[in-house]
């Protein structure tokens, strides 16, 4: 980052000396604008669960444990006032656990700066860290990638979620819970 500051300082000094062409050449050579092709992002629930399993329900940016989203939704089903859910993640309307513990897929190299939407560029992270990271690279944030966890050691409460649903099949009337239940069964079979 300091090299970039020195480059811009040199550019400003060249401008002050009336050397606009030299300043422009400095920018082009030392701190050029890079236009990246943006690729469409898309993944299925099955792909998400496969990634969460591969990462052992560990937030790859913090090393923290995350949990199967189905658990959160079941808690909201049973306790809508105490553990509210908002379908669009509105922080003022939903429990903070949906941000802190809800796993999502992030692109290690952001799509906005040329990263690809492919599994080798995916990492499990919390919604909160995903929002913080946004379109920034790990280097820009001075973050590092933590090792994946072991699904056999931490399954994100997936087995407990399946047991909970099978203990109260009324939960399957909620389409969201039903989707996560089916996806959970799939990854437990893998």
Regions found by a protein language model. Give the residues of each.
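Short beta-strand-alpha-helix junction that forms the catalytic/metal-binding core
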Residues: 56-59, 98-106, 110-131
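Short Cys/His-centered divalent metal-binding micro-motifs
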Residues: 67-68, 118, 122-144
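Short helix/strand-bridging catalytic loops that position acidic/His residues to coordinate divalent metals
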Residues: 36-40, 109-113, 145
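Alpha-helix boundary/N-cap detector
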Residues: 2-6, 148, 152, 175
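Short flanking/linker segments adjacent to small metal-binding domains or redox-active Cys/His motifs
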Residues: 163-190
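A contiguous, mid-protein "functional segment" used to position or interact
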Residues: 134-165
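A boundary/linker detector
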Residues: 1-50, 54-56, 63-69
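Short cysteine-rich loop/turn motifs with clustered Cys
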Residues: 45-102, 126
């Amino acid at each position: 980052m300091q090299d970039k500051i020195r480059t811009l300082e040199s550019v400003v000094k060249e401008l002050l000396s009336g050397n606009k062409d030299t300043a422009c050449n400095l920018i082009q050579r030392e701190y050029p604008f890079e236009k990246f092709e943006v690729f469409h992002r898309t993944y299925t629930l099955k792909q998400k669960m496969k990634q969460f399993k591969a990462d052992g329900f560990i937030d790859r940016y913090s090393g923290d444990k995350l949990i199967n989203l189905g658990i959160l939704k079941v808690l909201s089903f049973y306790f809508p006032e105490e553990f509210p859910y908002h379908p669009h993640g509105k922080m003022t309307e939903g429990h903070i656990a949906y941000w802190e513990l809800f796993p999502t897929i992030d692109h290690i190299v952001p799509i906005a700066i040329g990263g690809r939407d492919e599994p080798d560029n995916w990492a499990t992270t919390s919604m909160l860290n995903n929002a913080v990271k946004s379109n920034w690279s790990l280097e820009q944030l001075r973050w590092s990638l933590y090792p994946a966890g072991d699904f056999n050691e931490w399954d994100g409460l997936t087995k407990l979620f399946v047991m909970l649903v099978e203990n109260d099949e009324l939960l399957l009337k909620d389409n969201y819970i039903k989707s996560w239940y089916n996806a959970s069964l799939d990854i437990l079979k893998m």
